[in-house]
Amino acid sequence: MILIVTNKEDTHPTPVIEHLTKSGVPFFRFNTECLLTDYAIEWFCINNIIDFSITNTITNTTILGSQIKSIWERRPEKPNKSNATDPTANKICLEEANAFLVDLQYSLKNIFSIGSAVYDNVAASKL
C-alpha cells in the first residue's frame, strides 16, 4: 500500500489517486494538518510484533504500518487544529502531534519513498 503524506489543500495528488484507483493500487491519503481532528492512531503488539494503524475517521479507511510498501511525502504540514477547548491544552496537543509526526517519519525512514523529511532536510533537523 502507498502512503500519501500531504495536506487537504494540495490538489496535485488527485490525478495520481484517480490513476491508482483505476489501476487497483491500494493507497492511503494522510492529511497531516488534520492529525488531531480527522484521524485515530493506535500502536499495538500482537504475537511480539509491533505495528500501528492510522484510521481516517471521516472516510473510515485504515492503513496498518505493516502494509506500507512505499511513501509519497508530498506536502505534509504541521497539525493546526485540535479538539481541545483550553488554549494551553490546545498548544500542548499541537506540539505533541507535531512531535509524533516527526517520530512517525523517522520510524518509516527505511521504506521506499518519494520525498522524505528525514533525508531531504537533514541540515534542518535538530534531532
Regions found by a protein language model. Name each.
Residues 1-3:
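Extreme N-terminal starter segment of soluble prokaryotic enzymes
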Residues 7-19, 30-127:
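Conserved N-proximal alpha/beta basic substrate-recognition cap immediately N-terminal to
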Residues 24-30:
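Short hydrophobic/aromatic-enriched beta-strand-loop microsegments
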